[in-house]
A protein has these predicted regions:
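Metal-dependent nuclease catalytic regions and adjoining charged, substrate-binding loops involved
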Residues: 2, 116, 180-183, 193-253
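Short, structured patches in soluble enzyme cores that scaffold and shape functional sites
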Residues: 143-145, 170-171, 207
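Short amphipathic alpha-helical face segments that pack within enzyme cores
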Residues: 72, 189-196
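Short, glycine/acidic-rich beta->alpha junctions
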Residues: 152, 185-189
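Metal-dependent nuclease catalytic cores that hydrolyze phosphodiester bonds in DNA/RNA
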Residues: 1-155, 253
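Conserved catalytic cores of phosphodiester-cleaving nucleases, focusing on short active-site segments
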Residues: 156-178, 194
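Short histidine-centered catalytic/ligand-binding loop motif
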Residues: 59-62, 107-111, 176-185, 221-223
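Secondary-structure boundary elements
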Residues: 132-137, 163-166, 196-202
C-alpha cells in the first residue's frame, strides 16, 4: 500500500505520513480526528450515536492522573532521551510555579518532581527486570503504523517491535486481575488491530504493578485474538452506520 486515504478524504503517501507520526501533535491531534484507533473504537463498540457524542465532547479541563502517569512511565521506559522535552516543577500542582508553567506549555508536558520520581521507580522496575532485558534485545521502540482495516484508516504505535512480535507496556494497580481486565478494557481489540497494522503473528503484554512494582509478561490464546477481531469488525460496521446518518447526528447530538 503506497497511499492511504484518511477519514476526511485527504490522501497521503504512507512513507510521508509515517514520518509525520513521530510528532505527537500530528499523531494525537490531526490523526486523532482523521484516523481511527483502538481507543476510538471504544465508543464505536457501544453504538454509532456514542461515537458521534464522543466526537463532540470538549477536551477535558484536567487529565486523569492515571493517564498522566501512564504516559510518563512509557516515556521513561521506552524513550528516556525525550525527558528533556518535559518541564519539571519542583513544587506541587497547586503552586503558582506549576500553574504558570501549564499556561505557557501543554499540560501533558509539565510534571511535578514528585510525579517524575514516582513514575521513574515504576519504569525502573521494568527496565531492571531480567526477563524484560532479554525480551527487548534487538527491539525497536515507539514505532508508528497506519493501514486500512475493512476499508477504514487505523493508526497505532507499537511500544516494542520485534520480528513478527508486538509488545505493549501496561500499568495496573493490581497485576493479579490483569487477565480479567484485559477483556473489559478491550485489550483484545488492540491486540488484533496491532497484529494487522504491523503484519505480525504474536502480541505480548508487559505489565507493571504501580504499587508493588511487580512485572509480569502475558500472552493470550487464539480465542482472545478472535474476540478482538470480532470487536474490530463491529466497530467498523458501526462507523459505516455513523457515516450513513452523519447529517442527523450533526444536527441532533
Amino acid at each position: 500500500m503506497e497511499t492511504i486515504k484518511l477519514l476526511n478524504n485527504e490522501e497521503f503517501k504512507v512513507k510521508d505520513i509515517l514520518s509525520k507520526m513521530d510528532d505527537d501533535s500530528f499523531y494525537y491531534g490531526y490523526l486523532g480526528k482523521n484516523a481511527l484507533s483502538s481507543s476510538m473504537c471504544k465508543s464505536l463498540l457501544e453504538s454509532p450515536e456514542a461515537y458521534a457524542n464522543k466526537l463532540k465532547e470538549p477536551p477535558k479541563a484536567k487529565e486523569p492522573q492515571p493517564f498522566r502517569d501512564g504516559r510518563l512511565i512509557h516515556l521513561l521506559a521506552l524513550e528516556p532521551h525525550r525527558i528533556d522535552e518535559l518541564t519539571i516543577i519542583d513544587s506541587t500542582k497547586g503552586s503558582n510555579l506549576y500553574k504558570l508553567a501549564v499556561q505557557e506549555k501543554p499540560a501533558q508536558s509539565v510534571y511535578t518532581r514528585s510525579e517524575l520520581n514516582r513514575c521513574q521507580e515504576i519504569a525502573d522496575a521494568v527496565l531492571e527486570n531480567i526477563n524484560y532485558q532479554e525480551l527487548v534485545k534487538g527491539a525497536k521502540f515507539e514505532i508508528p503504523a497506519i493501514a486500512n482495516y475493512n476499508g477504514l484508516p487505523f493508526r497505532g504505535k507499537a511500544d516494542i517491535l520485534l520480528a513478527g512480535v508486538v509488545c505493549d507496556i501496561k500499568t495496573t494497580s493490581d497485576i493479579s486481575t490483569f487477565k480479567q481486565a484485559a477483556l473489559l478494557y478491550n485489550y483484545d481489540l488492540q491486540a488484533a488491530l496491532y497484529l494487522e497494522l504491523f503484519d505480525s503473528f504474536e502480541f505480548k503484554y508487559v505489565v507493571v504493578d504501580k504499587r508493588s512494582k511487580e512485572v509480569g509478561f502475558f500472552e493470550f490464546n487464539d480465542e482472545f485474538i478472535e474476540s478482538g477481531y470480532a470487536k474490530l469488525d463491529l466497530a467498523t460496521e458501526n462507523y459505516y452506520k455513523y457515516l450513513e446518518n452523519k447529517d442527523f447526528y450533526d444536527l441532533n447530538i
